[in-house]
Structures are given as C-alpha cells and as structure tokens.
Amino acid sequence: MGYFSFFIFLNMIVEQINLSVDNFILGRYVGTTAIAIYSIGMQLNGYFITFANTISSVFITKVNMIVAKNENKDDEINGLFIKVGRIQFIILSYIFLLFLFCGRYFISIWAGEGYNESYYIALMLMIAIFIDLIQNIGIKILEAENKHKMRSIIFVLISCINLLISIPLAKNYGAIGAAVGTAAAFLLGNGLFMNLYYYKVINIDIFVFWKNIFKFIPGLIIMSVIGMFLNNVIDINTSTEFIIFILIFSVLYLIINWNFCINSYEKNLIKVMLNKFKFKLKVVNDLN
C-alpha cells in the first residue's frame, strides 16, 4: 500500500510542479507583470482541468469493478475508455470553443483590462492538456491495476523537458513563451508517451479510441465556422451580447452534435439530464 500511495502522491506533486514551473521561470527571468498575466491563463486552465476530473471521478467505482474481474476485462476497459473519452470530448470541446470565441470578453470583465495575453496563454494550456483530459479515465485504470508508476516517471521527464524548453522561450517571449514551452512538453508527454503506455501496458486499443474521437471532427469544424460567423454578427462588448452568444452557440452545438456526432448512449444521457432539469423547473414553479 505504501508503494501504491507513494506513486499516486508523486503524480500529484509532479503535476503541480508542471503547472507552477512557469511562474517560477517568469519570476526568475522576466518579472511580476508576466507572472500576473500567466497566472490568469493558468487559473482558467485549472478550472478546465477540475471540470474534466469531476466527470471522470464518477466512473471510479465502475473502473474498480471491471479491474476486479478477470474475464473480458480488456474489452470492458476499452469500452469504458472510449465511452468516457467521447463524453469528455463533447463537453470539453464545447467549453473550449466557447472560450475561444468569448474568452477575451470574459477575461476583460473577470480580470480587468491589460490581460490580453492571458487569453492566448489559457488557449495554449487548454490545447496542451486536452488529450490528457479526454483520456484521464486511464489514470483511474492505471491506479486500479497498480500500474501508475511509469506515469509518474513520464511526468518527471515532462517536468525536465518543460524546464529546458520554457526557460529560453520565457527569456525571449515572456509569458507567451513560457506557455509555449509547457504546451510542447505536455503534448509530447500526453499525446505520445502516455498513448503508447496505454496501448502497451493496459491493452487500450488507442487506434479505435482515436477513430471514435475523430468522428467528432466534422461537427467541430462546423461549430468553429458558426462561431466565427457569430463573432462577426455579435460584437461581444456587453454582458447581454455575451449571454446571447452563449445561448445561440449552445443550442446550435447541441443540434449539430445530436444530428451528426453523438451515439444513442450519449443521446440518452442528454435526455436524462434534460428531464431532470424539467423536473426541477416544475418543482420550482409548483413552490411559487
């Protein structure tokens, strides 16, 4: 148990180091203004990560039940990995696209003026962590199978790569440079090393996983075009325009994905959530 807990603890420590190393670099080589700008972007990325972790935590019991079985374990793990990954992709893509099109205004009202670079930093960090987040049920599987040691080692290497890349970039390009270095290290670690590890060690059919994820790309492209069109039509300068944009974009995102991307299981999940929402509205109306 001590061995098991140590590497979970090491994972947590290394992840925190990876997320905070840029602030140390910026403080050492650039200055406090760069730290403030970077911190806003990092904080927004932190919310992005927290949201994704909340979703995957729902499936921890299911993971433990599957791992405890011996028969057909690999098939069930693959099915769960793909199922949760698809759900994560749908939700996180929605959040990412909304931030892509509304993020500048949101930062201006949340942090104030003078933090334009924070928008680009947040985008880069979100892109860098995106693969890890849609696959983070894999972390729970590794822990359940007591195979998480290598992930800790991989992330120690990512920390070293992050440090080596980010220092010269931060010196030359400030907070943006530091974000580029971190993004590159995370994409290398999560996009290449961890996918190979999942494939080789816990027998995840990573090719089938990505085949499922790529089915969302046409819808993502359509929504990106729609978002750019809405940005030209709705100039987001007030909270009213901000809310109108979100409402229109959200409805269109649901329609496009419903018709072209999501499967019957995901449609049933949406129906259940909508029914719960309708029930709560009915209760509120009855009380009034």
Model-derived regions, located:
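Interfacial transmembrane-helix starts/ends
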Residues: 2-5, 55, 72-102, 119-125, ...
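Membrane-proximal transmembrane or re-entrant/amphipathic helices at the cytosolic face
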Residues: 204-205, 228-288
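Short membrane-interface helical motifs at transmembrane helix boundaries
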Residues: 94-113, 168, 172, 229, ...
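Hydrophobic/aromatic end-of-helix segments at the C-terminal termini of transmembrane alpha-helices
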Residues: 18-26, 30, 59, 102-107
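Short runs within selected transmembrane alpha-helices of multi-pass transporters and secretion channels
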Residues: 11, 15-19, 42-45, 49, ...
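Interfacial/gating helices of multi-pass transporter permease domains
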Residues: 1-4, 24-46, 116-120
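Interhelical loop/hinge segments that connect adjacent transmembrane helices in multipass membrane
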Residues: 1-19, 62-79, 199-214, 268-272, ...
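Helix-loop junctions and terminal segments of transmembrane helices
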Residues: 41, 45-85, 89, 139-144
